[in-house]
Structures are given as C-alpha cells and as structure tokens.
Regions:
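Noncatalytic alpha-helical scaffold of FAD-dependent oxidoreductases
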Residues: 1-358
Length: 358
C-alpha cells in the first residue's frame, strides 16, 4: 500500500543501488538457544525451525506483516505491531556499516563478539562462524524490548505504548529503516508456550473493543501473545487476495514458502522477456488459479463476517487461555457481540497476515 521501505518511484535525487542479501542467510544459535545471531538475509522461517529443538521461539513467527520476512528487515522497521506481550523488534547488539559525518565509510561492531580488527576479518569470521564461546561477550545491552509489557499495561498514559519512529526504540540497526547497512543482529529468543488458543471476537460497536482492550491490558495476569483488528472490508480483501498464499501454506506447509518465492522469481524473470505478459505475472497467475479453489475459510468465520462489522483476533497462551475464556463469557452477557474459540488457527492468522503481502 505504501511502497514499503525499499526504493520506490523515480524521483530520487541520486543514483540507487539495490543489494539482495537473501543468500547471506546464516543463523547462529548461542547461549543454549536463549539468543541468536541473524545475518542480513536470514528469515523467520529458518529461525523458527532452528529454535524448535530448544523449546524457544523467535520474536515473530512467520512475520507480523508479511510472509517470508527477514530477521534484519523486521528489526530495521521495529516490526511486531500485533505482538502485545513482546512489543517491537529491538536490539542494541548489531554489526553494521555507516557513513560518518566526515563522509567516511566505517564498520561498527556492536554485536558483542570479538571477531577481529579489520572489516574483512570481522565479516569473514562472523559469516563462517569462526569464533568460540569465550569470544562472546554479554554487555549490559538489550537484545529485545524487555520492558514493553510494562508500557502496554499503562492504558491511561498520555502517549501510546508504541508508534512509528518511537525514539525510545531507535538504536543503531533497530528502526534504522535502511539508513545504515546491517550485516548481522543479535536477538533474544522466547520460551515457547505449552498451549495456545486463538479467540475470534466480533462486534458492531467499536467501543466494545475499547472496553475489552482496557480490561485485558490492565486486569489480566497474562497478556495476549498477539492481537489484530480487522474491519469487515479488510476481511473481504484478505479473503480474496490472500487465498492463493493460504492454500499453499495449508496444503504444503509454511516451510514450502521460501521455495515458492524462489519459483515465483524465476517465473517473473522469464515472463519479463515476453511483452505480452503482465508485470508480477506469477502473482496474477496464482490469484487467478485460486478463484477455482473452494472457499478456504471456516463457516463460523464467514457467519461472523456477515453478522459483525468489527473483528478481533486475539491469541492467548498457557494460563491466559482460561483467564480469557472466563472474561469473554462474562463480558458478552451484558455487551453487544460474541466470540468463539478457533480450531483453525492457521487460517485466522493468514487472513490478517497475508493482507500485507501484496
């Protein structure tokens, strides 16, 4: 919708160089899975698979705003808008290049690992993982926004818990939005919940959601893992334009997505050689074919779409599940709207995540 953070348009005042870093995709698990080092092109897909044996999770699963998101890309944009408990992606430990005020190009090693003295040595040692555990330092710097859960509970504060270009969470690579060249970041991981449950909430009164939000944030012992609002119009758009990606994830699994993107790139490069074929041919082809697939959304979701204008997808974990069940059952006895427990977590997550893909 906005062009994203990549170069967009033709009105720049200088030449532009675009570097695809997706093949620099190494991920190093350190401190028994409690932290990771993600290189420029490493993805959340790859990280999720690496952390599973440790019983840990990355900051985001799949990606809060797009399928196939990179770790570094999310950090550079302070991503994680739907994450209530974890907040925005943030770290004070990274390896990056910048232009100084004097116009000099320098490499800054703030990642907390002794990798050498000159840029070539530092980058080579990191990419090839030529460092030992005693070279990893643990400075008094954050590798996540570990105070966000306190800010988000302050529902009467004059400022929002988070917003674009929040100076509290702009630090080197974090929130840099492409103004520096990030080679690697160091991030905390999170203990995977034993149980998770998605609550699908519907109402025709926006104020109902305001009451729910304030109650959950200020009164619940356990914060939601995530929460995402959908208007009925957004629901319809996601249903139509995200159907192709959903079908792939549902039938082939999320691990197939990187292969799908690689195949799509090859198709688009081939299509560019034929003037009769449209730009982004693979996207248009997939969406066209998806029209022949049966409705992929559960009937109960469709019923809520027809009945309610406002929709809210809330994911709770562990003790928060029972807490939310009791709250919603009591709340809707005297308030307009209703809720149900979703048994189709993937489809619900896709409907609000995929809307940002295009």
């Amino acid at each position: 919708l906005t062009g994203g953070s990549t170069p967009y348009g033709y009105d720049y005042d200088r030449p532009i160089v675009i570097i695809n870093t997706m093949r620099v995709n190494g991920i190093h698990v350190i401190n028994e899975g409690q932290q990771i080092i993600g290189l420029s092109g490493s993805t959340l897909f790859g990280l999720e698979n690496l952390l599973e044996p440790y019983g840990r999770e990355p900051h985001s699963v799949i990606g809060s705003s797009c399928i196939g998101a990179s770790i570094v890309g999310g950090l550079c944009n302070n991503s994680g808008g739907a994450l209530v408990k974890r907040g925005p992606a943030y770290t004070e430990l990274s390896l990056y290049a910048k232009i100084t005020d004097d116009g000099e190009l320098v490499l800054v090693n703030d990642i907390g690992i002794d990798l050498g003295n000159n840029p070539e040595e530092i980058l080579t040692n990191l990419e090839q993982k030529k460092y030992s555990t005693h070279q990893i330092k643990y400075p008094k710097k954050r590798a996540s926004d570990n105070t966000y859960h306190k800010r988000v509970r302050d529902v009467d504060a004059d400022t929002p818990a988070r917003f674009n270009a929040d100076g509290r969470r702009l630090y080197a690579a974090s929130g840099c939005a492409g103004k520096i060249a990030v080679f690697a970041v160091r991030l905390d991981t999170y203990k995977a919940p034993k149980r998770s449950q998605v609550f699908y909430v519907g109402s025709n009164a926006a104020n109902t959601f305001t009451h729910i939000r304030r109650s959950i944030l200020s009164e619940f012992k356990t914060l939601p893992s995530s929460g995402e609002y959908l208007h009925r119009d957004c629901y319809d758009a996601a249903k139509k334009y995200s159907k192709d990606t959903f079908v792939v994830i549902d039938k082939l699994g999320p691990n197939f997505i990187p292969k799908l993107f690689g195949f799509k790139r090859k198709i688009d490069l081939l299509a560019e050689k034929f003037s009769i074929l449209p730009i982004k041919f693979s996207d248009k082809l997939m969406q066209f074919l998806s029209y022949f697939w049966p409705n992929h959304l559960p009937k109960r979701m469709e019923m809520y779409r027809d009945k309610y204008e406002h929709h809210w997808v809330i994911e709770m974990a562990d003790d928060g599940i029972d807490e939310a069940k009791l709250f919603f059952a009591d709340f809707f006895k005297s308030n307009e709207g209703n809720f149900f427990l979703s048994t189709h977590i993937i489809s619900i997550l896709c409907i609000f995540q995929n809307i940002c893909i295009r």
